[in-house]
Amino acid sequence: MKTVFVSGNFNVLHPGHLRLLRFAKELSDKLIVGVWSDRIAGKESHIPEDFRLEGIQSNGWVDEAFLLDESVEEVIRKLRPDIVVKGKEHEKSANPEAAILEEYGGKLLFSSGEVTFSSLDLIRNHIRELDHISINFPTEFANRHNVSKERLLEVLSKIDGVSVAVVGDLIVDEYVTCEPLGMSQEDASIVVTPIDSQRFLGGAGIVAAHASSLGAQAKFYSVIGDDDIGNFAMSELENSGVTPSVYIDPTRPTTLKQRFRADEKTLLRVSHLHQESIGSELRQIIKQEVHRSLPDTQVLIFSDFNYGCLPQELVTELIEAGQKNNVYMAADSQSSSQLGNVARFHDMHLLTPTEREARLSLRNQEDGLVVLGEKLSKHANAEHLFLKLGSEGMLLHARDDSNKKQTDRIPALNPHPRDVAGAGDSLLVLGALAIAVGASAWEAACLGSLAAAIQVSRIGNKPLRLDELQREFV
């Protein structure tokens, strides 16, 4: 494995740094970056060392980063990298690293990297940025159902400490930012060059991370492959405060969904996955682990992407176990093809399909939305049904205080979404948690819709925070 080492202050990750890191990564199998500690950097350190290290660790090209609290020469002697990369401006200066590298055959290279995009830091800021201005509170809907902001804040405060178990398909989402170069001369295809990439926890994993970030005690059950993507997912789960019971399936890779984007538009999506059901041994392990946790669990969430983690036999067994333990249950089953049947999650307290998923489940392309919702609710025996309609909002088919089913619509609360990925996950988890702690379906719909509006305000799946939701009530 070829290793490359880079070191520096990195007060601000400007485009020059990013080009240098990209150049270094292209030379290596493993890019290691040493960030000078406050002690070593001295007056050159304008930002605390922890923040500078975090900035480097967030870069998609960096495989390993650490605080460098000794001389660069000593670190090179310990690491023995194949190559050390420095900026072009150091080429005519004294470089004591050269003598050490020469001792064991290492190389010292100088480069700023190929200049491909001068505003990459702006892209990064754009990805992290959250646009609260475009989020609307559903005032008319709230008035129809006597939903007050004070009550919603009260519901949010009750989520703290709720015990949640999430079972489903773990996914890692990768956003590859590209610069378009033009049309190919050989065929009618667009030519791009990748200039940045960022990975996010997705699928059922982000559902568990949302729950934990909102204050719940989240346990997560799933499978991964024996690969770097799986290691990334495990690290993200643990950093989010989730307790993972995630098992390696040697027959499959960790599901990775790549989005290649340019100028804020997605050009292409590539999914690396196996859709076969998990084997009987893994199925038995997950069943036993979930069974063991259910007596102390208040909410059980199924997050199904039809990638094999939730075969019907396991689903049926877990539903029966949840009912025996009086656990509140919610489910979403996403169908990216003509496969999928959300109604297989029967007897749920909350079901959150899209219109397409509902029609696939019922094989019904004719009925209107209200009739469709009623039929699916009856077919799946769901207490509450949130039918997601994308930019048109959501249709609710839910029980009121008198135990009668009512239908209403809540509009989409963000008319200018930047990335719709993950909206359904945030709706599912906050809707389920809200109803589980005593909220009405209408209150849960308000909170879930606000969560979705926040999620689509930014690029990539990031765990929801309570303060983000509370800010919408100010």
What label would you give each PLM region?
Residues 379, 383, 413-472:
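Conserved post-catalytic alpha-helical subdomain immediately downstream of the catalytic base
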Residues 312-407:
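Conserved phosphate/ATP/ADP-binding segment of small-molecule kinases
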Residues 1-144:
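Nucleotidyltransferase catalytic core that binds NTPs
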Residues 5-17, 167, 191-201, 308-309:
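Short, glycine-rich nucleotide/cofactor-binding loops
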Residues 30-37, 87-88, 219-224, 329-333, ...:
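Short internal beta-strands
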Residues 172-301, 462-474:
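Conserved N-terminal subdomain of the carbohydrate kinase-like
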Residues 14-29, 200-214, 319:
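Histidine-anchored nucleotide/phosphate-binding helix
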Residues 1, 141-181:
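Positively charged, low-complexity intrinsically disordered leader regions
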